[in-house]
């Protein structure tokens, strides 16, 4: 798996992250474009744990909607991960191809389907991504979407893990994580997917919070302020307050006006406040909104009311792989 840096010609810089710089590169032997993720190594501290985690996860995750890790080059002061080259991230794609960053619904449907397939593969392999956002979703010129940057991902084979709650860019962070949950499930990636879904439709982030508390308030303004009746056990969270302003849930049709009722039903299922009420990636892929992709010759189905979630949740309860520990 370990190659030599002389195999690759470094081209322009593509971006800089918390622990790595990414360059466009070319395989000298084949001429194929690659992305070179360079991580500087501190001689005293050695390879960062984030990088080791990313490498071990990426090697295991072989799927059409997950960026392929081709090679790992380890030198004394540098670690280079060689990934398949993708043309742009979703954020850039929306800026270039969107109408004021909002995408055509056919494109949104294709990208959501691919995103959920990538998420389902991760979850089936007991991996949480934990940092899904438009900047971490990569698009190539064939219109394929792939999950990238597993720097914060963590395999969750051991039940009752207490994870650090310093994950996921604020805007895409699930309310249970914001409230201080340290033992969460696949449902945190589902919330992020819902936020990305709405953003692709409107061109604007759904919950652009400035800090943890502000992020919660922005969610409550739209989804309603939760309480023990609507979310049993919420008062046990570390960051819970019993004096939050009371907001009533808003009609999502007003927030995402260009989305049809079936799409709104899916969005509502992804953005359930209680983690155990959120739909799973597998259930989401079977949602009628995707039938033109999954069953192109079938008769269209219609849901009676996109806001009647209770009945749907009783039929398809979210089954977390890790038990929720509060």
UniProtKB/Swiss-Prot annotation:
Residues 305-326 have a biased composition (Low complexity). GO terms for molecular function: ATP binding; cyclin-dependent protein serine/threonine kinase activity; protein serine kinase activity. Transmembrane segments: none annotated. GO terms for cellular component: cellular bud neck; cytoplasm; nucleus; Pho85-Pho80 CDK-cyclin complex. Its EC number is 2.7.11.22. Gene3D superfamilies: Phosphorylase Kinase, domain 1 (3.30.200.20), Transferase(Phosphotransferase) domain 1 (1.10.510.10). InterPro entries: CDK, Kinase-like_dom_sf, Prot_kinase_dom, Protein_kinase_ATP_BS, Ser/Thr_kinase_AS. It catalyses: L-seryl-[protein] + ATP = O-phospho-L-seryl-[protein] + ADP + H(+); L-threonyl-[protein] + ATP = O-phospho-L-threonyl-[protein] + ADP + H(+). It holds the Pfam family Pkinase. Residues 300-326 are annotated as: Disordered. It comes from the Eukaryota. Keywords: ATP-binding, Kinase, Nucleotide-binding, Serine/threonine-protein kinase, Transferase. GO terms for biological process: DNA damage response; filamentous growth; G1/S transition of mitotic cell cycle; lipid homeostasis; negative regulation of calcium-mediated signaling; negative regulation of glycogen biosynthetic process; negative regulation of macroautophagy; negative regulation of phosphate metabolic process. The active site is at residue 131. ATP binds at residues 14-22, 37. Coiled coil: none annotated. Residues 8-290 form the Protein kinase domain. Interacts with a number of cyclins. PANTHER family: CELL DIVISION PROTEIN KINASE (PTHR24056), CYCLIN-DEPENDENT KINASE 5 (PTHR24056:SF46). When phosphate concentrations are high it phosphorylates the PHO4 transcription factor thus establishing repression. Belongs to the protein kinase superfamily. CMGC Ser/Thr protein kinase family. CDC2/CDKX subfamily. This is Negative regulator of the PHO system. The gene is PHO85.
């Amino acid at each position: 798996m370990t190659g030599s840096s002389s195999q690759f010609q470094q081209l322009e810089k593509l971006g800089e992250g918390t622990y790595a710089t990414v360059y466009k590169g070319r395989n000298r032997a084949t001429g194929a474009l690659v992305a070179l993720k360079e991580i500087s190594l501190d001689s005293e501290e050695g390879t960062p744990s984030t990088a080791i985690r990313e490498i071990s996860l990426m090697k295991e995750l072989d799927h059409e909607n997950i960026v392929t890790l081709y090679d790992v080059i380890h030198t004394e002061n540098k670690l280079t991960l060689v990934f398949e080259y993708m043309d742009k991230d979703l954020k850039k794609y929306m800026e270039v191809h969107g109408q004021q960053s909002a995408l055509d619904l056919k494109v949104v449907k294709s990208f959501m389907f691919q995103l959920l397939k990538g998420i389902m593969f991760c979850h089936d392999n007991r991996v949480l991504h934990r940092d899904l956002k438009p900047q971490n979703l990569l698009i190539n010129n064939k219109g394929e979407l792939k999950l990238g940057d597993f720097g914060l991902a963590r395999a969750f084979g051991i039940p009752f893990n207490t994870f650090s709650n310093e994950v996921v860019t604020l805007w895409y962070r699930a309310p249970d994580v914001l409230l201080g949950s340290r033992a969460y499930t696949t449902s945190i990636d589902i919330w992020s997917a819902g936020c990305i879904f709405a953003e692709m439709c409107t061109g604007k982030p759904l919950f652009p919070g400035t800090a943890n508390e502000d992020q919660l308030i922005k969610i409550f303004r739209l989804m309603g302020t939760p309480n023990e009746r609507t979310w049993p056990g919420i008062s046990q969270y570390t960051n819970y307050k019993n004096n939050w302003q009371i907001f009533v849930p808003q009609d999502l049709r007003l927030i995402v006006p260009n989305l049809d009722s079936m799409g709104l039903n899916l969005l509502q299922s992804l953005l359930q406040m209680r983690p155990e009420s959120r739909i799973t990636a597998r259930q989401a892929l079977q949602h009628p909104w995707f039938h033109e992709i999954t069953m192109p010759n079938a008769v269209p189905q219609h849901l009676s009311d996109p806001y009647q979630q209770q009945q749907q949740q009783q039929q398809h309860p979210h089954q977390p792989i890790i038990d929720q520990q509060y």
